[in-house]
Amino acid sequence: MDLRAADAWCEDRGVDVAFLRVPGTAIGALTPAVRDGFDLLEITTVLRARPGAGDWERGRIRAGTSADAVELGEIAATSFRPWGRFYADPRLRHRADELYRTWTVNSLHGYADFVLVSDDDGPSGFVTGHLDDGVGRLGLLGVAPAPPWARLGVVTRLLRSVLDRFGADGVSRVLLETQSHNRPMQAVLTSSGCTLDSVSACLHKWYR
């Protein structure tokens, strides 16, 4: 990893902030990156799961459409506090809600290969999925405010359905990413049969 070349590239192009991900297999690169001005904000875990074989539309799950943009955007704007690394960056924290809102709306308009919605007389949660050369990747999973038991039910329902949807798409495996400190989500994923695939460190560096 040539940090000097990366710095020069960012400076030449007027980049405000650079994001760096260091895989666990290259952990020795962390110290040079921090010395170069990167801030370590998050340790990320990637878990793997088997694709499902059921009907992904069961249990009040449906495909998301552009008509869901406002409601899913509202869910996204509150779902990821305080877990996402954008909340850990003091210069991005005030914009993090809007970032997740935009990310979700863009997913409905083609950034994701599909969006599934849990609909209980209105959206109660959503999950985005990406297809990558035979691998299914879960993007965002957001749940509307509700009592903990109700949120757990929505998360479990969405996880089951997204695995079934990936199975219908013929993927060979599924990867799901979350923060190492997000213990509630870690517990749900492991109880759903997910196993550890890899870890990585996420860092930010501001240039201006």
Question: Across the structure, where does each feature detected by a protein language model lie?
Answer:
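A short, internal acetyl-CoA/4′-phosphopantetheine-binding micro-motif in the GNAT/acyltransferase core
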Residues: 1, 23, 141-151, 178-179
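Helix-loop element at the rim of GNAT/NAT acetyltransferase active sites that forms part
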Residues: 10, 15, 75-90, 107
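A short beta-loop-alpha structural element at the N-terminal edge
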Residues: 60-83
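Conserved acetyl-CoA-binding loop-helix of GNAT-fold acetyltransferases
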Residues: 2-9, 143, 150-168, 187-191
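A conserved beta-strand-loop-helix scaffold within acyl/acetyltransferase catalytic domains
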Residues: 85-99, 106-145
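Glycine-rich acetyl-CoA-binding "A-motif" of GNAT/NAT acetyltransferases
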Residues: 41, 121-126, 184, 197
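C-terminal appended segment following the main domain
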Residues: 160-208
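Acyl-donor-binding surface of acyltransferase catalytic domains
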Residues: 1-67, 177, 192, 200-205
